Amino acid sequence: MFDQTTHTEAHPLTVGKIETANGTIKPQLLRDAVKRAVSNFFAQLDGQEAQEVYEMVLCEVEAPLLDIIMQHTRGNQTRAANMLGINRGTLRKKLKKYGMN
């Protein structure tokens, strides 16, 4: 669908391992897991119109990401914001949104 060449190509995020049709084991990329989950979501709609899909998916990924980052930085918001590549004020808003303040 789209080609996203970023610095993460060398170290893609994985969520586990999957067995291919020929029996080899390969890493399951987070990107593929999200794609599969969104496809399953649409398949289960049974003709209903989807609403706010972007926000739904973003919340499903962003909340656990923030939780892990905050644990990793032992609650240091400045370090967490730097690791995420966002402004500390933006991080504070996101933490508040998910009740992590």
Curated annotation (Swiss-Prot):
DNA-binding region boundaries: 77-96
MF (Gene Ontology): DNA-binding transcription factor activity; sequence-specific DNA binding
Coiled-coil residue spans: none
PANTHER family: DNA-BINDING PROTEIN FIS
Protein name per UniProt: DNA-binding protein Fis
One Pfam family this sequence matches: HTH_8
Residues of the signal peptide: none
Entry keyword Transcription regulation: yes
InterPro entries per record: Fis_DNA-bd, Homeodomain-like_sf, HTH_Fis, Trans_regulatory_Fis
Similarity field: Belongs to the transcriptional regulatory Fis family.
UniProt entry keywords in alphabetical sequence: Activator, DNA-binding, Transcription, Transcription regulation
UniProt key word Metal-binding: no
Source species, domain of life: Bacteria
Subunit record text: Homodimer.
Protein task: Activates ribosomal RNA transcription. Plays a direct role in upstream activation of rRNA promoters.
